[in-house]
C-alpha cells in the first residue's frame, strides 16, 4: 500500500478512491489523565530516588531509572496519541492531525480474525487483530501495538469508535461490505 492509496485528509476519499470506513481518535480526557498519571509517577520516583536519605545506592538508582522510564513513556504516549487510526476499504493505518498518512498497521487482506471479547488479551477500550503473517514489533503507547501476528488497538482511544471499527473489520472478514 502506498500513500496514494490512502485518503489524504479526514473523512472522505483519497486519490485512489479509498473511502474511510471508520476513524478512532484519542479521547481527550483519557489522554490527559494517562499523561498526568505517567508524569506524576515519573516525578514521584525521581523525587524519591534523589531525596530518600536511607536506602542503598542500588535502590536509589532503581527509583531514578524507574522515574526516567515513566517520563520517557509519557513523552512516547504524548507523541503517539497525536495520531488517529483510520480504517479504509484496504487497510488500517495511522493519520496525523492534518490527515497525512503514517504507518500502515495492517491491510484488510492480511487480517485473519478480530478478538474483542472480555477475556481477549487486548488494550483497554479496544480489540485485537490476528494477522495471516507475522510482522515486526511496534508500539505506539496508548494507541496500538504489534507483536508477531497480533495487533492490539486501544488504550486512550474512544471506546465507541474502536467498537465500530472492530465491527466493520469483522463484517468485512465475513465477506460483507459495510457501505451497503
Question: What name fits each language-model region?
Answer:
Residues 1-55, 150, 180:
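N-terminal membrane-targeting/pre-transmembrane regions
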Residues 21-22, 47-50, 65-68, 140-143:
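Short amphipathic alpha-helical segments, especially helix-boundary/capping motifs
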Residues 86, 123, 145-147:
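A short, structural micro-pattern
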Residues 116-120:
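Short, conserved beta-turn/loop elements at beta-strand boundaries and strand-helix junctions
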Residues 124-128:
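Short aromatic-glycine-enriched beta-strand elements
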Amino acid at each position: 500500500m502506498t500513500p496514494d492509496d490512502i485518503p489524504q485528509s479526514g473523512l472522505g476519499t483519497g486519490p485512489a478512491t479509498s473511502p474511510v470506513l471508520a476513524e478512532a481518535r484519542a479521547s481527550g480526557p483519557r489522554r490527559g489523565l494517562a499523561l498526568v498519571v505517567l508524569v506524576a509517577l515519573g516525578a514521584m520516583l525521581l523525587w524519591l530516588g534523589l531525596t530518600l536519605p536511607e536506602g542503598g545506592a542500588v535502590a536509589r538508582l532503581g527509583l531514578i531509572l524507574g522515574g526516567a522510564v515513566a517520563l520517557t513513556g509519557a513523552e512516547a504516549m504524548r507523541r503517539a496519541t497525536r495520531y488517529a487510526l483510520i480504517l479504509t476499504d484496504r487497510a488500517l493505518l495511522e493519520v496525523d492531525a492534518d490527515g497525512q498518512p503514517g504507518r500502515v498497521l495492517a491491510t484488510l487482506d492480511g487480517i485473519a480474525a478480530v478478538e474483542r471479547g472480555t477475556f481477549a488479551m487486548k488494550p483497554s477500550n479496544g480489540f485485537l487483530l490476528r494477522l495471516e503473517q507475522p510482522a515486526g514489533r511496534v508500539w505506539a503507547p496508548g494507541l496500538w501495538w504489534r507483536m508477531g501476528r497480533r495487533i492490539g488497538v486501544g488504550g486512550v482511544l474512544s471506546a465507541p469508535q474502536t467498537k465500530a471499527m472492530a465491527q466493520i473489520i469483522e463484517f468485512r472478514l465475513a465477506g460483507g461490505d459495510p457501505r451497503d
